[in-house]
Amino acid sequence: MPEIAQPTPMMRQYLETKARYPDALLFFRLGDFYELFFEDALTASEALQITLTARAKGDDKVPMCGVPHHAARGYVARLLEKGFKVAICDQVEEPGKSAIVKREVTRVVTPGMVFDDQVLDPREASYLGVVALAEGRAGLALLDASTGQLQCGEVPDDARAVDELRRAGVRELVLPLGADAARAERIERAVGVPAARRPAADYERADDRLRRHLGVASLDGFGVGGEPLGLAAAAAALAYLADTQRATPRHVDRVSRLRTEDVLLLDEATRTNLELERTLNGGRKKGSLLALLDRSVTAPGGRRLAEWLRYPLTELAPIHARLDAVEELAGASVAREDLAAALRPVADAERLLSRLVLGQGNARDLRALAGALLALPALAELLGGRAAALLRDAGEGTRGLEELAAHLDRAVAEEPPATLREGGIIRRGFSPELDEIVAVAEDGKGFIARLEAREKERTGIGSLKVRFNKVFGYYLEVTKANLHAVPSDYERRQTTVGGERFVTPELKRFEETVLTAEERRIAVEGRLFEELRQRVAEAAPRIRTAADAVATADALLALARVAAERGYCRPEVDGSEVLEIVDGRHPVVEAVLPEGPAGFVPNDVLVASRGALECERLGALHVITGPNMAGKSTVMRQAALVTLLAQMGAFVPARKARVGIVDRIFTRVGASDDLARGRSTFMVEMTETAAILHNATRRSLVVLDEIGRGTSTFDGVSIAWAVAEHLHDQVGCRTLFATHYHELQDLARERPAVRNLTVAVREVGDRVVFLRKLVQGGASRSYGIEVAKLAGLPAEVLARAREILKNLEALEVDEGGHAALARGRKTRRADPQSQLGLFAPAPAPADPALEEIASALRATEIDALRPLDALNLLAAWRAKLR
């Protein structure tokens, strides 16, 4: 804490406040600015690129910087992006009422505690992740404070905890103080977001504190009983929310079980490789699967769709329920358009509710909420007549708020100002008390004119005037010549040179009314606003239920729109261990290609787990070979995406699809290093492969692309072969294994469930045409030099590459043109003395004499030669060599 020899009362107030929030940048309200001092000023001026000045007091020079209060939201948003916390210290009384204005921290804004709609992405959840630690296990809570969504549960180890936190995309992490510090730091580093430490008290008595907050006798009805670590994390999440926002989070009115058991598991590598929410190139939304699918009308619908994409299902009933709803809407274009029209007026009720309940909302939020609630009856009517149960349930969930909607509509002005002090947030006619005050405030001049006219007529004093000054307020001025006509009810206030000043009881009442009308208007409007806010808070559970129903209906509409517009089919999802995709397409790649012959080439993927009845026909492990750029990775990714889409309850890009439930999808596709953690490309590849081998089950879908390419050829082939064997022999799951190691095709000779597939090419002269079609069989070439030519490598480099390739191909030793690895096969080895170095000079031209002798030798019938003839031939050949 900085020390100042003689701090002013204001600076003493600042230092006391800062001491309570040492880990936050303190925005301290001074008039029209938020000021920062000392280290906070140095940090903020650098982060925000604003001017750093100094506040001088004697020998003390205090570094300071500031931002206008009306522009603070933008500056706070920039600080949050850089991982800072910001404590907002506001003036909580009017200046002049005391020697120093009273100030309090009204809220602490952190990366996981954001409510400002100008900072939040409307289509992204904003999760705080809270971790509770115990020996061998971890409790997790995910809290989206902006919507009131709270989930909790337990996971078996820290690795799973990290994966769940990253899958949710948490913005901030809360870890316990006093726990295993090294363990907590490992989790913090692995998750990679700003973290806060909270005292053990936040985690204690969790069951009791949650029951009291939710107003229930037992948590069993929420399905979260029996997992004390999860409850501890949930209690800590609520404590952090209440502490940072300085309010009771009444909008968090329920808690649900963290979905770790009945959802398809997707590790971070798989989510990244499949580009579900961000592209590999640049990390952009555009070009991701979510960007393609999100045809939702509302922000909650977009968030719900993202949630479904992150957590595909593994239970058949809810999958089929979603598919039923999507099928109904996909087949009814008029119904889709009607539903979209009904959803458009529905604002983001979840986030509006959160701001209002926490005391951060304004009249515009109330007006937006009123508009959203007014739109619900039409939506309920539209959904209530649908056949699909999910659509009917969504319609039912939007009912019951008609009275509140009408009340808010009557109360709140059509276009209210942003702040109470501007006045005019309440409609005329809602409050007689307020209407009277407003009428007086707005009709003050008219009242004065009417009063003056009445008094002139009553007294007969034509020169009588009603005047005002700051000392006496309103008064009646009468000249000396007319003092004899002054009525008895006039009360003398002041004698002047030219006459006297009087007041009347009516003028006193008017003065009191007019002079305080604006303050009274603000006070009454503030009271009415608070009453409306409380009424909204009391209806929070019903509003959240309706918002949830809107989100579900909108997400289903989005999936139906995509299905209808892109020609997707309803997948057959069952309990088998089969994946059959007929004419499947990659949804994102297809969308960017033109239609017709130059468009996307569909492919079939037919694979089953070992032990499944269909395995003998389809195979369990497909070794896919073929040229670079031929489309191997695309085919494998689209198989994974079709599986994922089917299990999230969406239609799929295929002519026909059957998807047996998958418990996990693993992908090892592409190459990248992790320099920050000291891991090479090959180390990253091996780490991800190890995770697959340790965690895959027979129900998993595994997609592997070019395992082993990051090391030497022999090491790479050996690793790839061993990995494929393990997946076939030990795991037996559905596996797509793309490789340029053609030796792996020999697996099919000794493994019954291995199938060889290749992507077809056609050679036209010296040109290679990639047909993008997956066919039975193996590839003998990778056409890497042809791809290098397409990439624009210099001609001399390509020519030299062809020479080297010929040298290498000349050393191939078996009938397949490559080393044979299958057990029991006989191989021939090249003479090591004759092997050429990979980059050895090209061999010298052959000797013409040797060529002539070799030709003669090949033409000679040795069995017909007499010994003398043979000796003569040898002598002649020796002479040629000389």
Swiss-Prot record:
PANTHER family reported in the protein's UniProt record: DNA MISMATCH REPAIR PROTEIN MSH1, MITOCHONDRIAL, DNA MISMATCH REPAIR PROTEIN MUTS FAMILY MEMBER
Pfam families found in the cross-reference section: MutS_I (PF01624), MutS_II (PF05188), MutS_III (PF05192), MutS_IV (PF05190), MutS_V (PF00488)
GO CC terms in record: cytosol
Source organism superkingdom: Bacteria
Signal peptide: none
Organism: Anaeromyxobacter sp. (strain Fw109-5)
Entry's Gene Ontology BP terms: mismatch repair
Binding-site residues, ATP: 626-633
MF annotations from Gene Ontology: ATP binding; ATP-dependent DNA damage sensor activity; damaged DNA binding; mismatched DNA binding
Keywords: ATP-binding, DNA damage, DNA repair, DNA-binding, Nucleotide-binding
Protein name per UniProt: DNA mismatch repair protein MutS
SUPFAM superfamilies, A to Z: DNA repair protein MutS, domain I (SSF55271), DNA repair protein MutS, domain II (SSF53150), DNA repair protein MutS, domain III (SSF48334), P-loop containing nucleoside triphosphate hydrolases (SSF52540)
Disulfide bonds, paired cysteine numbers: none
UniProt KW Phosphoprotein keyword: no
Sequence similarity: Belongs to the DNA mismatch repair MutS family.
Annotated function: This protein is involved in the repair of mismatches in DNA. It is possible that it carries out the mismatch recognition step. This protein has a weak ATPase activity.
InterPro entries assigned to the protein according to its UniProt record, in alphabetical order: DNA_mismatch_repair_MutS, DNA_mismatch_repair_MutS-lik_N, DNA_mismatch_repair_MutS/MSH, DNA_mismatch_repair_MutS_C, DNA_mismatch_repair_MutS_clamp, DNA_mismatch_repair_MutS_core, DNA_mismatch_repair_MutS_N, DNA_mismatch_repair_MutS_sf
